[in-house]
UniProtKB/Swiss-Prot annotation:
GO cellular component: cytosol
Documented EC number(s): 6.1.1.14
Upper lineage: Bacteria, Pseudomonadati, Pseudomonadota, Gammaproteobacteria, Vibrionales
One biological process term in Gene Ontology: arginyl-tRNA aminoacylation
Subcellular location: Cytoplasm
UniProt-listed PROSITE patterns: AA_TRNA_LIGASE_II_GLYAB (PS50861)
The protein's name: Glycine--tRNA ligase beta subunit
Length: 693
């Protein structure tokens, strides 16, 4: 008989940024354990709150099904000797099965006859195995730093206080993480019943909400926060900034979400909104309120914020006033730092960068600034941006690191540089570049908006990549300098803006600016290989298959925009009817040429062409070579591959009718030359022999 199953683990406060991950992993792990144990069920739903992880399994079978286990033994021909006596192999197999050889059955297949043992295995009751399954699911959670507590030897992400396991209304007895299962559920610390018993799995989570004032359904809590926050913002004429990561964190911090609106003095709005938002979101987990949506030029920060309380107070005004008192000193600090910092122009802080170390072997932030300045000017020249403005932006790029605001609110680096540069009267492109130098900050982030910003952003990232590789600290598992993200940022900028830039030139220029600081003689090669490797993850995320990416990577094109054109062309080619046949032919040609140990002529000898099929292919290759020159010259690889698809018929005919490895050496070499020329046409774009069916 199928019943609902509940397991709830009551803990001390779980890390809010990990709560969803833990709950989803618990559900996935437990479902995998149920599948492995062959326990029928109709789905697993997870619940998570700050002090609990729980699962409910719908219609969980009360026992495993009975089954017949078959164990095949040796072939009959090997199981008996010439006199018909069991061999040692047969006897050993039979002993392992707990039978004698003459008790074994026979299994006949098209490959012969085998000894067979069949055993009926009774299914175990769910109550006897589910505790072990749950323990395994919890043991395999992604916990980086488990902890011990009290005098226990068990480890978990936080101390475990309660354990409840119910199968319908039956208590499943057992112990996990040193805690015995019982019917006790803990409620909210300050509301409802702090402790009560639960009679059946079906009561969960409703009983916890009704009696314990804890909303265990994570998604329901999140939905309430989103809906009520937007309503609260609309009530003050604004729109709430409900960044998903912050919403997730707040959802993980509260058991009973109560959304409230507070305000602060309008005089603080004279401070750049980024600094105010940083302290509201980062320090206090508040949601700022804006006048308009993102992207609207009229968007302004309003003197309100929304927060989520974990208690339903009879006097919410006191809760609101308390939060206003907490945030006010932080906003006052931001105001003070802003006013103080503006008393000195950014450029005056440049010498102070000598006191800040970028990396011991690579020098100070001032050294990095000098390199960025030079490299930004070089890149600006290549992409047609203003060279002098790019150099000026490079010079000022890191100066805001020496301001009080950025020292106190580190996430405002860049954006505060922009505001201070505007105050100093710097050109707008220069000021904007100080903020956009860090773009793109993450996958899918916006790119720098102008040429000056682009030059500085690329220069900063390339300097870091080349420098760290240059001292032999390429990322392996961890990536403390975020070189993967920096590499992808450079590639995205080049590809999406279509710049005709070559990584070989960029890396060489960046390397030259380090003087004798670098110790890795292969730094240029290493950096280019690393950056090209980032393409694999990027294009996979874009939906391109691995074999398409590998086909292009095999040619190692070092111009990112050119790489992009090749990937898209090969993807288009793969959908053509001729693609599979030509990919197979290219693979065959590659294998044939790999086995030939010798030199081939650059051109075929027309006089040695004998078969009609090889003459036709030779003519097609010659015509195609000339026809494709304009497409190759302009990088129109899609057009080139579409034309190359026309070679399917003469290629198929060649392999059907021509013996490549002829006895006549001259004839064989001529045919190999023809195939080599054919393959080289495709290799000018990609190695399509790597395409899979």
């Amino acid at each position: 008989m199928a019943k609902e199953f509940l397991i709830e683990l009551g803990t001390e406060e779980l890390p809010p940024t990990q709560l969803r991950t833990l709950a989803e992993a618990f559900a996935a792990n437990f479902e995998a354990e149920l599948k492995g144990a062959e326990l029928a069920h109709e789905g697993v739903k997870w619940f998570a709150a700050p002090r609990r992880l729980a699962l409910k399994v719908a219609a969980l079978a009360d026992s495993q099904s009975d089954k017949v286990v078959e164990k095949r033994g040796p072939a009959v021909s090997a199981a008996f000797d010439a006199e018909g006596n069991p061999t040692k192999a047969a006897q050993g197999w039979a002993r392992g099965c707990g039978i004698t050889v003459d008790q074994a059955e026979r299994m006949v297949t098209d490959k012969g006859e085998w000894l067979l043992f069949k055993q009926e295995v009774k299914g175990q009751p769910t109550s006897q195995i589910v505790v072990e399954l749950a323990a395994k699911a919890l043991a395999n959670l992604p916990i980086a730093k488990p902890m011990r507590w009290g005098n226990k030897t068990t480890q978990f992400i936080r101390p475990v206080k309660t354990l409840t396991m119910l199968m319908g209304s039956d208590l499943i007895e057992g112990e996990i993480l040193g805690v015995a299962s019982d019917r006790t559920i803990r409620g909210h610390r300050f509301m409802g019943e702090q402790e009560f018993t639960i009679d059946s799995a079906e009561q969960y989570p409703a009983i916890l909400e009704e009696r314990g004032k804890v909303m265990a359904d994570y998604e329901a809590r999140k939905a309430i926060i989103l809906a009520d926050a937007q309503k609260a913002a609309a009530a003050v004429g604004g729109i709430a900034d409900l960044e998903d990561d912050l919403v997730e964190e707040v959802t993980s911090l509260v058991e009973w979400p109560v959304v409230l609106t507070a305000k602060f003095e309008e005089e603080f709005l004279k401070v750049p909104s980024e600094a105010l938002v940083y302290t509201m979101k980062g320090d206090q987990k508040y949601f700022p309120v804006y006048s308009h949506e993102n992207g609207d030029e009229n968007k302004k920060l309003l003197p309100n914020f929304i927060f989520v309380s974990n208690i339903e107070s009879k006097e919410p005004r006191y809760v609101i006033e308390g939060n206003e008192k907490v945030v006010r000193p932080r906003l006052a600090d931001a105001e003070f730092f802003f006013n103080t910092d503006r008393k000195r122009p950014l450029i005056d802080r440049l010498p102070e960068l000598e006191q800040a170390i970028f990396q011991k072997q690579l020098g100070t932030i001032k050294d990095k600034t000098d390199r960025i300045t030079e490299l930004a000017g070089y890149i600006a020249e290549q992409i047609g941006a203003d060279v002098e403005k790019s150099k000026r932006a490079g010079l000022l790029a890191k100066c805001d690191l020496m301001t009080s605001m950025v020292f106190e609110f580190t996430d405002t680096q860049g954006v505060m540089g922009m505001h201070y540069a505007r105050h100093d009267g710097e050109a707008e492109e220069v000021a904007v570049a100080l903020n956009e130098q860090y773009m793109p900050r993450f996958a899918g982030d916006e790119l720098p908006s102008n040429g000056v910003s682009t030059a500085v952003a690329m220069a900063d990232k390339l300097d870091t990549i080349v420098g760290i590789f240059g001292i032999g600290q390429a990322p392996k598992g961890s990536d403390p300098f975020a070189l993967r993200r920096a590499s992808l940022g450079v590639l995205r900028i080049i590809v999406e803006y279509g710049y005709n830039l070559d990584l070989v030139d960029l890396v060489a220029k960046a390397k030259s600016l380090f003087g004798d600081r670098l110790t890795n003689d292969n730094v240029e090669q290493d950096v280019i290989e690393f950056m090209l490797g980032r393409f694999r993850a990027w294009y996979q995320d874009e939906g391109f298959s691995v074999d398409i990416i590998q086909a292009v990577l095999a040619r190692r094109p070092t111009k990112p925009a050119d790489f992009d054109q090749r990937v898209k062309a090969v993807s288009h080619f793969r959908e053509l009817e001729a693609a599979e046949s030509l990919a197979a032919a290219n693979k065959r040609v590659g294998n044939i040429l790999a086995k030939f140990d010798g030199e081939l002529a650059a051109d075929i000898d027309l006089a040695l062409l004998q078969e009609d099929a090889e003459k036709a292919l030779a003519e097609s290759v010659e015509v195609m070579t000339e026809a494709l020159e304009p497409a190759f010259a302009t990088g129109n690889y899609q057009e080139a591959l579409s034309k190359l698809a026309d070679l399917r018929e003469p290629v198929d005919a060649f392999f059907d009718n021509v013996m490549v490895m002829a006895d006549d050496e001259a004839l064989k070499k001529n045919r190999l030359t023809l195939l080599n020329n054919l393959r080289n046409l495709f290799l000018q774009i990609a190695d399509i022999s790597l395409l899979q069916k």
